[in-house]
């Protein structure tokens, strides 16, 4: 996988070149950082809310452009939502997932949605 930034925050190496997506990714990085600092219900619920909103927006962009990788991408989103819904406190998993999802799965749609 890709290295996990320390401190855990978005940087230009994660840029998709879609402003809305990049801004939402920054929010997800921050949400996971907050959860790593204090694993509590408020932080988890906020991360769930931001993640759900972002995934919906991203999936709508993919559908609107008839992106060929939509089904695979949506499954990755669904799997992460399930992980949040059954949260076990594994912040390292969440950090790794976001970094690797952006750099492997999201980067596939650059210039295509």
Swiss-Prot record:
Keyword S-adenosyl-L-methionine annotated: no
Record-given protein name: Hemerythrin
Task of the protein: Hemerythrin is a respiratory protein in blood cells of certain marine worms. The oxygen-binding site in each chain contains two iron atoms.
Domain of life per record: Eukaryota
Lineage, broadest ranks: Eukaryota, Metazoa, Spiralia, Lophotrochozoa, Annelida
SUPFAM superfamilies linked: Hemerythrin-like (SSF47188)
Annotated Gene3D superfamilies: Hemerythrin-like
Protein family membership: Belongs to the hemerythrin family.
Binding site for Fe cation 2: 58, 73, 77, 101, 106
Subunit structure: Homooctamer.
NCBIfam families the record matches: hemeryth_dom, Hemerythrin
Keywords tagged on the record: Iron, Metal-binding, Oxygen transport, Transport
Residues given in the record as Fe cation 1 binding sites: 25, 54, 58, 106
Molecular-function annotations in GO: iron ion binding; oxygen carrier activity
InterPro entries assigned: Haemerythrin, Haemerythrin_Fe_BS, Hemerythrin, Hemerythrin-like, Hemerythrin-like_sf, Hemerythrin_metal-bd
Keyword hit for Cytoplasm: no
